């Protein structure tokens, strides 16, 4: 039971061939051909307004020096939101439920902010390891605690995204199995459970969008400490 339950998080294979290879050999699908017809559509306007609103909130903590990162953060947030939502469709694979991918995004971004801080403002970066006004006897302990706290940031960033999406997928899988099982016992109970599944799906769509936003804004806050 547990094997079949968690098998939905395995990378899909077809005829003993990993389908991820198919994605890797089709990079041109990632590029969009912008033209006059695309620029004037309502959907493009909706995407533009939505991204403008979200990025204004994400970049709000940063000063002018941080605006050079706006393309990276907007691309990161849009990619995570897209992958999270697409993973809710049937017969799809959600790569953001894999801790390896999330850590692969979190560690380089976090490490880049740390290196940027130590390279441009080494004194300020070191000052973050010891809170202002701390007693002299507690300084060594506080330095160790703050160092561990900073080192745990990418792990917490990746685990947060993985845990939230994995829990939602498992809950949807369990409730959908309950819907099929209750059809033989009571149509009414099955219908009520199906209604619950619909509301849960709507909630998971919101969670998928929010988690992409949270990931991007946390990286922004890490960068703000090192600017």
From Swiss-Prot:
Protein known as: ATP synthase subunit a
UniProt cross-references to InterPro entries, sorted A to Z: ATP_synth_F0_asu, ATP_synth_F0_asu_AS, ATP_synth_F0_asu_bact/mt, F0_ATP_A_sf
Gene Ontology molecular-function annotations: proton-transporting ATP synthase activity, rotational mechanism
Membrane topology: Multi-pass membrane protein
GO annotation, cellular component aspect: mitochondrial inner membrane; proton-transporting ATP synthase complex
Major localisation: mitochondrion
Places the protein is found: Mitochondrion inner membrane
Annotated function: Mitochondrial membrane ATP synthase (F(1)F(0) ATP synthase or Complex V) produces ATP from ADP in the presence of a proton gradient across the membrane which is generated by electron transport complexes of the respiratory chain. F-type ATPases consist of two structural domains, F(1) - containing the extramembraneous catalytic core and F(0) - containing the membrane proton channel, linked together by a central stalk and a peripheral stalk. During catalysis, ATP synthesis in the catalytic domain of F(1) is coupled via a rotary mechanism of the central stalk subunits to proton translocation.
Source organism of this protein record: Branchiostoma lanceolatum (Common lancelet)
Pfam family, any one: ATP-synt_A
Keyword annotations of the record: ATP synthesis, CF(0), Hydrogen ion transport, Ion transport, Membrane, Mitochondrion, Mitochondrion inner membrane, Transmembrane, Transmembrane helix, Transport
Subunit structure of this chain's protein: F-type ATPases have 2 components, CF(1) - the catalytic core - and CF(0) - the membrane proton channel. CF(1) has five subunits: alpha(3), beta(3), gamma(1), delta(1), epsilon(1). CF(0) has three main subunits: a, b and c.
Family classification: Belongs to the ATPase A chain family.
Ranges that cross the membrane: 14-34, 69-89, 98-118, 137-157, 169-189, 205-223
Keyword presence, Cytoplasm: no
């Amino acid at each position: 039971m547990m094997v079949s339950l968690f098998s939905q998080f395995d990378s899909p294979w077809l005829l003993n061939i990993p389908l991820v290879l198919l994605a890797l050999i089709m990079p041109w699908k990632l590029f969009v051909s912008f033209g006059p017809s695309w620029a004037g559509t309502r959907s493009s306007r909706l995407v533009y307004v939505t991204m403008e609103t979200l990025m204004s909130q994400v970049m709000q903590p940063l000063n002018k020096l941080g605006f050079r990162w706006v393309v990276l953060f907007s691309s990161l947030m849009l990619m995570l939101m897209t992958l999270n939502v697409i993973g809710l469709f049937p017969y799809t694979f959600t790569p953001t439920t894999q801790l390896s991918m999330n850590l692969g995004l979190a560690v380089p971004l976090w490490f880049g902010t740390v290196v940027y801080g130590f390279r441009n403002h080494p004194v300020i970066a070191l000052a973050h390891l010891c809170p202002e006004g701390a007693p002299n006897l507690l300084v060594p302990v506080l330095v160790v605690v703050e160092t561990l706290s900073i080192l745990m940031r990418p792990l917490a960033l990746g685990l947060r995204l993985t845990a939230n999406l994995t829990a939602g997928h498992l809950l949807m899988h369990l409730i959908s199995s309950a819907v099929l099982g209750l059809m033989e016992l009571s149509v009414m109970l099955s219908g009520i459970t199906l209604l619950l599944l619909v509301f849960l799906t709507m909630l998971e769509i919101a969670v998928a969008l929010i988690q992409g936003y949270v990931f991007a804004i946390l990286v922004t806050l890490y960068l703000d400490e090192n600017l």
